[in-house]
């Protein structure tokens, strides 16, 4: 199990990313637009840099929903490999069967 503080930190980051998503997208559009003036582009870059560091989506980490484990997490299920195995053995994951050949 991951520490509760790490889980809470990740939830706080998710909320921050969601809060600033539209504003970041607008600023990035100004920066990437070939029609924008150099001054507008510069102001957009400065405004983007002044936003909180955790507002960037690249700061998010996929964690297991049950344990908070940061590594070995399957995106499709949102579970770490060991929790996915336990859930599959219990039959909690529909359509997932143990491989045999």
Swiss-Prot record:
Protease among keywords: no
Domain of life: Bacteria
Stored InterPro entries: Ribosomal_uS14, Ribosomal_uS14_bac/plastid
Keyword annotations: Ribonucleoprotein, Ribosomal protein, RNA-binding, rRNA-binding
GO molecular function annotations of the record: rRNA binding; structural constituent of ribosome
GO CC annotation: cytoplasm; small ribosomal subunit
Pfam short name (any one): Ribosomal_S14
GO annotation (BP), single: translation
Subunit structure: Part of the 30S ribosomal subunit. Contacts proteins S3 and S10.
Family: Belongs to the universal ribosomal protein uS14 family.
Function as written in the Swiss-Prot or TrEMBL entry: Binds 16S rRNA, required for the assembly of 30S particles and may also be responsible for determining the conformation of the 16S rRNA at the A site.
Annotated protein name in UniProt: Small ribosomal subunit protein uS14
């Amino acid at each position: 199990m991951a520490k509760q503080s790490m889980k809470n930190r990740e939830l706080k980051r998710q909320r921050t990313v969601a809060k600033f998503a539209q504003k970041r997208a607008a600023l990035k559009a100004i920066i990437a637009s070939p029609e924008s003036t150099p001054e507008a582009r510069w102001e957009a870059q400065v405004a983007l840099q002044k936003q909180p560091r955790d507002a960037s989506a690249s700061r998010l980490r996929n964690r297991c929903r049950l344990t908070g484990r940061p590594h070995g997490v399957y995106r499709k299920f949102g579970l770490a490999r060991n929790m996915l195995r336990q859930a599959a053995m219990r039959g909690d994951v529909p359509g997932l069967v143990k491989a045999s050949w």
